[in-house]
């Protein structure tokens, strides 16, 4: 049967992981986006590069009163979206950059602001503006990897680049710096996880997620961010579940939540990061340090905020700023709670519930010098671009997720009617690799890739360089389902694919309610089901949770305008590493009723390739079901076999890590 992926509506396009075709999107993407891209690139080119003598100050060109309040955060410091003290200035810059009526006025104003504010803050605010201005549709949001490679590559690698640059050995070939040879430190308990923690694409995704879902966003900036709070909950929950799965792949126990701020922090961490232009060195955190009060933030305030949120969850309602009760025990409760816990400016009562998530990043980032007694810089947890490198990130976010799970526990488990899709039965699910030689076995391996760093940084004074980095990858595979439609008419379905490790760190199989906390989303796509038997085949590279390889390693010029948000889990990390002997992994497929699940018939053309984690940009989230359905609520049945309805199926897969190294794509 022809199971063509539906591409006529927003939900169809986004959920299938397939972008709308260029002809249908031509009206949404500005015609001159390539020219605008060059102007944006020129604007950001000196953010992290030396400003040369030909720089011309733009003071006096516009009304200075418009710029009042700018420059609060000193230049050469790291801007943190987590630090609320930076919010007023960042929000003002965003508002100023959204205000101009034309692109030319926007660029002119941005050029003026650029030299008045902190460089890092400017990049963030500019990125938010580009992502949300109508005249920038199709223009790439500046890739943080390109602007700040020294936030993603260890100082040892930057030093090697600088050595080659100083030699001037650029002749007729771009030099390749091998970042895979950075010496191992087997005393570090996180050594086995650095491929995940320090992955360029994963950390870039986290940064850009916070660009398109800024905590400082308000409806007056250009509309409501649909289900933003729920997206905060779900995307970060998925990051923790993926990290736990990588730990189990390496025979390490799952991460423990950091929930008592009077206890020593188990995880020590050294970022090995220095911003070369400014000399900003991200602080090292020894194992066993204890979080201390900050000058304006005592730990008791964090306990108070957490307890107030927990009281609201147990009562089933929050107290709004105008003292009314806001119910939580409904479909929108998780969204409201996400805004409160993050806490974004959309929180129902920021004064009362505080800023639990963000300020925990701040207090953790300043843990080695909380009073600034010794002039130490902040740690990786302070910066959105670097925080996911730190193992503490996952301990902290597991604590945050436990708060959300307290809310989910108050909701009734799904009943069979809510789970079932009448007349639809999933008969089989097989996972096949591209060459078709074996079934339900997928192999993973190391992939070497080349990351290009442009000329002009303090460490690339003579020309551009290529850096060879190592990351995880997997062979191409397909989901093959046999689905029976017992009705006499065609049905439209949404196929939801999840996966979870089967055994815990002791080798014992999980009961389903415990296993659901480790479930990672793999894909979500739509199908037409004709009456009778249907064969459904979906490739892994069309996943609705991932961004393509080129989003991270390709040239900006080669990216499609529809991929301009740079948000999405790296496609090469869709699966966990697995084990040499094979990791037992269960893949679940659930087919639900698309006619009930779809939100609208509006087509999406921008940033639609990772909609499950990143949402549909400037539009409604294209799925009415709660994120993570049906694993988002308590499951009383001990096994999937007792839980499932006819429209669900599970199959066991072996993920085998080969240890092989594949060479970089293309010529060196």
Swiss-Prot record:
Molecular function as annotated in GO: metal ion binding; oxidoreductase activity; oxygen carrier activity
Pfam family, one: Hemocyanin_C
Binding-site residues, Cu cation B: 357, 361, 397
Tissue distribution: Hemolymph.
Binding locations of Cu cation A: 206, 210, 236
Chief place where the protein resides: secreted
Disulfide bonds: 567-614
Entry keyword DNA repair: no
UniProt keyword annotations, A-Z: Copper, Disulfide bond, Glycoprotein, Metal-binding, Oxygen transport, Secreted, Signal, Transport
Organism domain of life: Eukaryota
Signal peptide (residue range): 1-22
InterPro entries recorded: Di-copper_centre_dom_sf, Hemocyanin/hexamerin, Hemocyanin/hexamerin_mid_dom, Hemocyanin_C, Hemocyanin_C_sf, Hemocyanin_N, Hemocyanin_N_sf, Ig_E-set
Glycosylated residue positions: 322
Function per UniProt: Hemocyanins are copper-containing oxygen carriers occurring freely dissolved in the hemolymph of many mollusks and arthropods.
The protein, known as: Hemocyanin subunit D
Organism: Scutigera coleoptrata
């Amino acid at each position: 049967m022809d199971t063509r992926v539906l591409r006529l509506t927003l939900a169809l396009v986004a959920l299938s992981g397939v972008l709308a075709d260029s002809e249908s999107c031509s009206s949404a993407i500005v015609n001159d986006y390539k020219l605008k891209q060059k102007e944006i690139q020129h604007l950001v080119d000196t953010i992290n590069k030396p400003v040369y003598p030909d720089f011309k100050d733009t003071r006096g060109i516009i009304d200075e009163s418009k710029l009042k309040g700018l420059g609060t955060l000193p230049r050469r410091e790291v801007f943190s979206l987590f630090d609320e003290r930076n919010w007023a200035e960042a929000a003002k810059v965003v508002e100023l950059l959204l205000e101009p009526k034309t692109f030319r006025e926007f660029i002119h104003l941005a050029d003026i602001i650029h030299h008045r504010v902190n460089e890092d803050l400017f990049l963030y605010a500019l990125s938010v503006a580009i992502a949300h201005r109508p005249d920038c549709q199709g223009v790439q949001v500046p890739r943080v990897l390109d602007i700040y490679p020294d936030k993603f590559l260890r100082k040892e690698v930057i030093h090697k680049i600088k050595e080659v640059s100083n030699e001037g050995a650029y002749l007729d070939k771009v030099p390749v710096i091998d970042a895979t040879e950075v010496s191992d430190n087997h005393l570090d308990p996180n050594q086995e996880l650095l491929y995940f923690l320090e992955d360029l694409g994963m950390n870039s995704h986290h940064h850009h997620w916070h660009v398109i879902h800024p905590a400082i966003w308000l409806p007056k900036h250009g509309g409501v961010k649909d289900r933003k709070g729920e997206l905060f909950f779900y995307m970060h929950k998925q990051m923790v579940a993926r990290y736990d799965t990588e730990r189990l792949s390496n025979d390490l126990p799952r991460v423990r939540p950091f929930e008592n701020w009077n206890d020593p922090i188990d995880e020590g961490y050294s970022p090995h990061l220095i911003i070369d232009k400014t000399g900003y060195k991200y602080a090292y955190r020894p194992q066993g340090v204890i979080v201390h009060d900050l000058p304006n933030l005592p730990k008791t305030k964090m306990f108070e905020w957490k307890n107030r949120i927990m009281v609201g969850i147990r009562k089933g309602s929050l107290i709004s700023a105008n003292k009314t009760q806001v119910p939580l025990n409904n479909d929108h409760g998780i969204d409201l709670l996400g805004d409160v816990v993050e806490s974004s400016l959309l929180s129902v009562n920021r004064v009362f519930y505080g800023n639990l998530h963000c300020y925990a990043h701040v207090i953790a980032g300043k843990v080695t010098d909380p009073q600034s007694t010794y002039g130490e810089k902040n740690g990786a947890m302070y910066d959105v671009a670097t925080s996911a490198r730190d193992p503490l990130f996952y301990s902290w976010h597991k604590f945050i997720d436990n708060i959300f799970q307290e809310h989910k526990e108050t909701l009734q488990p799904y009943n069979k009617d809510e789970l079932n899709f009448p007349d639809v039965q999933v008969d089989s699910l097989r996972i096949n690799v591209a060459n078709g030689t074996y079934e339900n076995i997928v192999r993973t391996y190391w992939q070497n890739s080349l990351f290009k760093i442009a000329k002009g940084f303090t460490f690339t004074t003579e020309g551009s360089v290529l850096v060879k980095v190592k990351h995880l990858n997997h062979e191409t595979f397909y989901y093959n389902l046999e689905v029976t439609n017992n009705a006499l008419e065609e049905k439209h379905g949404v196929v939801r694919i999840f996966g979870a490790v089967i055994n815990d760190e002791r080798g014992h199989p999980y009961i389903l309610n415990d296993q659901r906390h480790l479930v990672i989303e793999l894909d979500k796509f739509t199908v037409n089901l004709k009456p009778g038997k249907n064969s459904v085949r979906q490739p892994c590279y069309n996943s609705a949770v991932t961004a393509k390889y080129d989003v991270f390693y390709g040239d900006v010029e080669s990216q499609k305008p529809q991929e301009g948000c740079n948000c999405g889990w790296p496609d090469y990390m869709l699966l966990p590493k697995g084990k040499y002997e094979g990791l037992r992994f269960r893949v679940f497929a659930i087919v639900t009723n698309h006619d009930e699940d779809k939100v609208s018939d509006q087509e999406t053309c921008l940033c639609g390739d990772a909609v499950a984690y990143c949402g549909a940009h400037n539009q409604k989230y294209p799925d009415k079901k709660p994120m993570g359905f049906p694993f988002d609520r308590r499951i009383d049945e001990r096994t999937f076999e007792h839980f499932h309805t006819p429209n669900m199926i599970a199959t066991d897969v072996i993920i085998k890590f080969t240890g092989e190294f594949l060479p970089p794509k293309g010529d060196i």
